[in-house]
Amino acid sequence: MGFFSRGLLFISLAINTYLDGLRSFGYHVFNLSLHILNSILVFYIFQKVLVQFRNQIQTSKNDVSISFIAASIFLIHPIQTESVIYIITRSEILASTFYLCGFLIFQNFLELKIPKRLLKKTFLFLSIIFFAVVGFSVKQTLATFPLILFLYYIATCPLDSFTIKLLYKWRKHLIIVISVFLTLLFYKLLNDETFLIGPSNPDEMVGRAKYMLSQPSVIIFYYLKKILFPINLNIDPDIEVVTHIFSFGFISGIGSIVFMIYYFLKQGEWRFYLFFLAWFFIILSPSSSIVTLHDLAAEHRIYLALPGVIFIVSYGIFCFLKNLTYIKIINMLGLKILVSFQIILLFGILTIERNKVWRTELSLWKDSYKKSPEKIRPLINLARAHSIDGKQEVAIRYYEKSLLKAPGVFVPNYNLGELYLKDNRMEDAIIRFKTALQLNPNIPETYSKLGEIYLEQKNWKLADFYFKKCIEIDNRFPQVFKNLGILHFYHLKNLKESLLYFSKSLALDPKQKDASEISKLISKYQRGKLNLPSQKGP
């Protein structure tokens, strides 16, 4: 695995593992610390925004309250729970740290206009490249970073600047080139499933065309709705798949996006609004267009896109409050404090409630199954959570229910086979494990389980067959080698072969149970004092 295949992410997880083992506390502290840091970065970024957009917006450049509201919303918004609590979604938080650091440095870079500060500008420029490259090693979201920087530069340039005049002069040519490029790109994406990312698995994904057609409605009617009204959050939402371009979901999603762009274009602060709207859409674009993912929607994907909406909302709140003070309803400072307190209190309560849902695996999947009763994954994971909680009968019931909905899924077949095996329902377990083998013949544990069952049933030949199939796929199972040793030593009477299996088992796990007995057997054989027994072994 290369450094740019999320190398830095796995390094951070490895450090946590080295320090804390598998105890989750250290992982959560790391994630939470990064999230707090990102909130501070959001505050300072918006402070810079107020300065660099000062000629376009209706506020003082020193108005800390707007930045405070924005950073507070980012910090305590309930939709951030999945990104912060779910350990593996550290990729979102860590990549965002580098993204936001690089963006803040770029804002400082734009303020250095004196030629004498060339050395400092060079240092800042190299720092931006560093954060972009290192951030890309965490998550490929950083691929959008150069475009965001370019758009910010354009948005903050005076209308009479050379850059704006040049773009205006060549606007028709640029529109044609961009339109042709996007048309060809989307045509290729929709007609070639393998373009850029390789083929998707049709059993696990909806396919790129349907995925892309579904995303406009996902962005508007799920992501944006959950940002503005963060209730009924769900780790596994049930999203309707859009199958054709003339469907209501696609047309309404695209129509809403076009309306927002048109509405903001009519505002006096249109460049401010359009930039942060672009921030939201562009950062979402990798997971909402080119890259076909297993889930149509996931709340952690909007972690870094969230500031785009937050900045617009925070500034909108400010403008609304300013208009109220014009009619002498209440003084501006008091109104800001009141609204800020209400937002923090409301989002804080909702976040606490959402954290309660994430407290255990069982509570999380109970919540998801309640909200997505037609989806198969919440049902399977709820069954697994009950199994971990020691409620085997409840787990069996949910797994059996999942197989009625989706009999062709590997996981419930295998897990149900394990539960049947624990419950001594051997024939039922065999059926489930053999079904699992048909669905995925490359899982060594399935062969191992069947070998154990046939060993228990004294069907030596089948036990031997399945154990050997297991180690053909993966030869790192000490228990399977031990079982083969027992089988060949005590039942099939193959002395040399059995000792080879025992030796391999001992080499893989020298501290296993019965290790001393196995060592004695090998030692006796080496001294020539070992005879094949007639009874069952260790």
PLM features: what roles do these ranges have?
Residues M1-L419, R432, E445, K449, ...:
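Polytopic membrane enzymes that build or remodel cell-surface glycoconjugates and lipids
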Residues I330, L362-P538:
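C-terminal luminal/periplasmic domains and tails of membrane-associated envelope-modifying transferases
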